[in-house]
Every structure is written in structure tokens, then in C-alpha cells.
Design a protein with these regions (language model features):
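N-terminal Rossmann-like NAD(P) cofactor-binding subdomain of oxidoreductases
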Residues: 1-133
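Charged docking surfaces used in two-component/phosphorelay signaling
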Residues: 110-184
Length: 185
């Protein structure tokens, strides 16, 4: 079963899965593995806590083998994908220090439907703007995945809306460890 529903809706569907059903979810419903963190960032109570343990944060380039053993496959968000894919290998190999600065820019389609209502009186189509500061929803998802590798990673993440419909660019500022060459990274 594939779902691309508003946050909270796939949780309801997951409560009715049959034994052989697999749910592939594009919402944030199962991205966060902690019900309290989910509520903090998404402002709604998780309605399928029992299924969190049956789900996996499925970034296939990183955890391909583990995906096949789960009933609920949660697809990462766009910003987290653009940030985690380049950083996880560097963190796993301990090539970089733990302070990471990410400056991300996205087309306005990535901010969801509500963005058009929120900015209807602004010139969304001709200017750039920061949003979701200081606590963008994807911070929780990114930090969760970092914590699986190393604790105490300091992430400074600033998302921007750009005057284009779709696309994403994340510029990531890292400091390599002293004994590491640029080629190693």
C-alpha cells in the first residue's frame, strides 16, 4: 500500500494492515521513532504508537538490507535526504567534526499546500525567504539519524523558500578532522 497523505492519516491506515500488507508512506507519520518527538514537531498525537516499532526510516542508499524486514517503510523528507546522503558516510568514517551547518533552498512546492495560503499576500514567486526557524520539522528527522551514528552532533539548519516551483539545494559546511585529507572526504 502506497500512501501520500497529510500527516496523521497513514497512522490510521497502519492500524488496519493485514499480516502480509506492507505500507510505503510518503508522509512524516513514521519518520520519527519517538512518539513524544513526533508530537513536539508535528503538533499532533501519534495514533499508531504500536506500529512505530514495525516501521523503518528508509533511506535505501544507507540501510538497504534492513528495509525488507519491516512492514512500514517511511520515506524520508526532501531536506533530510539532501543532507543525510552526503553526511552519513562521512560521520560513519569519523572524517568530520560534529558541528554541521546546512543552508538549504527549496522550491515552494516542497513547503506543502499550506504555503500558498500563508504567503498569498507576499511575493512568493519573486523573492527568497527563510522559514521554519528555529525548529523546522525536519530537524527531528535529521538529528534522529545522526544520533544513530554519533551523539552530540550540533546541527544548524536553515531552510529557505526560493522563487521556483520545485528543486532543492543544500549547501553543507563541515570541518574535517585534523588528520583527514580532503581526498578522504
Amino acid at each position: 500500500i502506497f500512501t501520500a497523505l497529510p500527516n496523521g492519516e497513514s497512522q490510521i491506515i497502519s492500524n488496519h494492515l493485514k499480516e502480509k500488507n506492507i505500507l510505503i508512506d510518503l508522509s512524516a507519520d513514521f519518520r520519527i521513532q519517538n512518539k513524544h518527538t513526533y508530537k513536539e514537531f508535528y503538533k499532533i498525537k501519534h495514533r499508531s504508537v504500536k506500529n512505530i516499532k514495525n516501521s523503518i526510516y528508509a533511506l535505501p542508499e544507507i540501510i538497504k538490507k534492513k528495509i525488507k524486514n519491516k512492514k512500514i517503510i517511511s520515506c524520508p523528507g526532501c531536506y533530510p535526504t539532501s543532507i543525510l546522503l552526503p553526511l552519513i558516510p562521512l560521520l560513519k568514517k569519523r572524517l568530520i567534526n560534529k558541528k554541521i551547518i546546512v543552508d538549504s533552498k527549496s522550491g515552494y512546492s516542497g513547503a506543502g499546500r499550506s504555503i500558498h495560503k500563508k504567503y498569498k499576500n507576499h511575493n512568493l514567486y519573486e523573492s527568497m525567504s527563510v522559514y521554519g526557524i528555529p525548529k523546522h520539522r525536519h530537524n527531528s528527522e535529521i538529528q534522529q539519524e545522526f544520533n544513530k551514528i554519533s551523539k552530540n552532533i550540533l546541527l544548524e539548519f536553515t531552510p529557505h523558500l526560493t522563487p521556483m516551483f520545485r528543486g532543492i539545494l543544500s549547501t553543507i559546511y563541515i570541518e574535517k578532522k585534523k588528520n583527514v585529507s580532503t581526498k578522504d572526504c
